[in-house]
Curated annotation (Swiss-Prot):
One MF annotation (Gene Ontology) recorded for this entry: methionyl-tRNA formyltransferase activity
Keywords, comma-separated and alphabetical: Protein biosynthesis, Transferase
Record field: catalytic activity: L-methionyl-tRNA(fMet) + (6R)-10-formyltetrahydrofolate = N-formyl-L-methionyl-tRNA(fMet) + (6S)-5,6,7,8-tetrahydrofolate + H(+)
Function field: Attaches a formyl group to the free amino group of methionyl-tRNA(fMet). The formyl group appears to play a dual role in the initiator identity of N-formylmethionyl-tRNA by promoting its recognition by IF2 and preventing the misappropriation of this tRNA by the elongation apparatus.
Chain segments annotated as coiled-coil in the UniProt record: none
One Pfam family cited in the UniProt record for this chain: Formyl_trans_N
Protein name as catalogued: Methionyl-tRNA formyltransferase
Documented EC number(s): 2.1.2.9
Entry's Gene Ontology cellular component terms: cytosol
Lineage: superkingdom: Bacteria
Disulfide bonds: none
Native source organism of the sequence: Oceanobacillus iheyensis (strain DSM 14371 / CIP 107618 / JCM 11309 / KCTC 3954 / HTE831)
Protein family per UniProt: Belongs to the Fmt family.
Amino acid sequence: MKRIVFMGTPDFAVPVLQKLLELKYDIVLVVTQPDRPKGRKKVITPPPVKEEAIKHDLDIFQPEKLRDDYKKITDLKPDLIVTAAYGQILPKEILEIPTFGCINVHASLLPELRGGAPIHYAIMQGKEVTGVTIMYMAEKLDAGDILTQVEVPIEQDDHVGTMHDKLSLAGANLLSETLPSLFNNEITPKKQDESLVTFASNITREQERIDWSKTANEIINQIRGLHPWPVAFTTYEGKVMKIWWGQELSKSSKSGNIGEIIEKDTDGFYVQCGNNTVVKVSEIQPAGKKRMLVEDYLKGSQDRIKIGIKLGE
């Protein structure tokens, strides 16, 4: 049985590790990021991959900087290194260790959406299809030759959370189909077309801010593409209000200035957007409060949401 070093950190990588274990591959080492402070109380918390590895009594390695600390991997002489959302770029010295190379499970159809937030960008850009790519690792980010790919449709009610789970499982299944062919030298790697490269760099605070001058469709894609993390936001009377969910309306009986609340009902409020479009907001997180339905928020007082207020100011 081939000796595999697995490298991954967040929830996305867990099904990939589980699949390798299910298929009885010899996981000689799990490399993951160091434990980090988490939550408001900054409790030191192990990454999900470490928690999964502990369940299976696997050897775990958590270097702060892999580039400076990889002798343990070299000494193991693995046949293959499999990575999935590990969080550090592998240096050339590591790429050259395994007989069958280093392969990565990436949540996009490369060469589109290289980088750390491909699921967010796929939804924010309004794509109807994304997918998973398994490719060789290269010194340049997500630029290695492609081994296999699978498409995964994005439904209208999908968001980052649902697509994260779909793509994670799709990646695990694709890996299980890819490895036998890889080990039997039955795959011809395909170079990425550099003219088609796009990037999905980590989400910035400004990308989380809703620009109400955009169309309702663009804003809903932004909300879906930032749900459930890091979450789109606006301001209401100068205070941050996170927008967890809403819907695009084909038309409204009323209109107003861009960003203005033009109407409300029992379960939402309506915001004027660009190109004479309207978004109905149905789930929010007001400043200093928990996430809640607008319906529940308004039960406290109808005055909590006022018609005529302009969001984003």
